[in-house]
A protein has these predicted regions:
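Conserved catalytic cores of soluble enzyme domains
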Residues: 70-190
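Hydrophobic alpha-helical segments that mediate membrane insertion or helix-helix packing
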Residues: 32, 59, 71, 117-119, ...
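Charged catalytic carboxylate motif
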Residues: 51, 177, 269
Length: 276
């Protein structure tokens, strides 16, 4: 792992509350930025944004994923419009990278205000399940609400109610899932990711698959290489399953509904017969 520019003209701090660098995960090149809440609260400022945008620029040139490890107090007020401009440049970098390289973000601490928008622009968002906070406006900003009543910034709410978070867990499990995700995704939109080494037999029998048709996670596990299934947005609307699997080394996206567990949850393109 190599750390990139430590000093980008900032007089505030040698790191300006974010560490940027690049390295490999299972032989795959990745670019990473990690916000440091112990320095200026990890807040977004002009140089902070420049360091992250620099990482995006390098990742786009090399065609490699960007991973963001977030712990940000939000906008650095003392930098005023310069900090606001920094958010704008970050959003532009993310928009230009969308559909070109994978963007993965993991929220380990606070992710408030403008940084929450950046998390929403990522392709995959992870969130630490106990102490992480993700919000544009704090829970107390909602009329009649307070944090103890309904913590709209917590991982449970963001994963179950809004669907803004794809995966939750402790720090170790999140890092492990990110490593797994990087290993099954193409590095960019032009990479020939047709096949990876696969020891599983494509033509093997899936005995008993007819008995698990009502629970697609089990069915997908049976047809996938080495029974690998990575379910996305697992907590959000459990009657539907979205997942990534591998078949003969090829990564495949899957969508299915759990008819066995939620047999009454049907999708209608016209008004439901029950409404008649």
């Amino acid at each position: 792992y190599e750390i990139t520019t430590r000093l980008v003209g900032s007089e505030m701090c040698i790191r300006d509350s974010v560490v940027t660098g690049y390295g490999t995960i299972g032989g795959c090149l990745v670019y990473v930025y990690s916000q440091d809440a112990s320095v200026l609260g990890g807040s977004m400022g002009e140089m902070h944004a420049k360091k992250i945008c620099s990482i995006y620029s390098m990742a786009m040139k090399m065609g490699a994923p960007v991973i963001g490890l977030v712990d940000c107090a939000g906008l650095r007020l003392q930098e005023a419009t310069d900090a606001l401009d920094g958010f704008g440049k970050l959003y532009l970098s993310q928009a230009m990278a969308s559909g070109v390289i994978p963007q993965i973000m993991a929220v380990f601490g606070t992710c408030g205000g403008g940084m929450a928008v950046a998390a929403g622009m990522a392709d995959f968002t992870f969130m630490e399940e106990k102490s992480a906070q993700l919000f544009v406006n704090a829970p107390n900003a909602l009329e009649g609400n307070y944090k103890a009543k309904c913590d709209t910034a917590a991982a449970a709410f963001q994963s179950k109610e809004t669907g803004a978070v794809d995966f939750t867990g402790d720090e170790a499990s999140i890092l492990a899932q990110i490593r797994t995700l990087v290993s099954i995704l193409p590095a960019n939109n032009e990479e020939d990711f047709s096949e990876a080494d696969c020891q599983d037999d494509l033509n093997r029998m899936c005995t008993g698959i007819e008995g698990v048709a009502g629970d697609p996670v089990q069915a997908l596990s049976m047809i996938s290489d080495n029974h690998f299934v990575m379910e996305i947005k697992k907590a959000y609307e459990p009657s539907m399953v979205t997942a990534l699997i591998r078949i003969n080394g090829v990564t495949v996206g899957c969508v299915a509904n759990r008819t066995e567990l939620y047999e009454d949850c049907l999708l209608y393109t016209s008004p439901s017969p029950r409404d008649a």
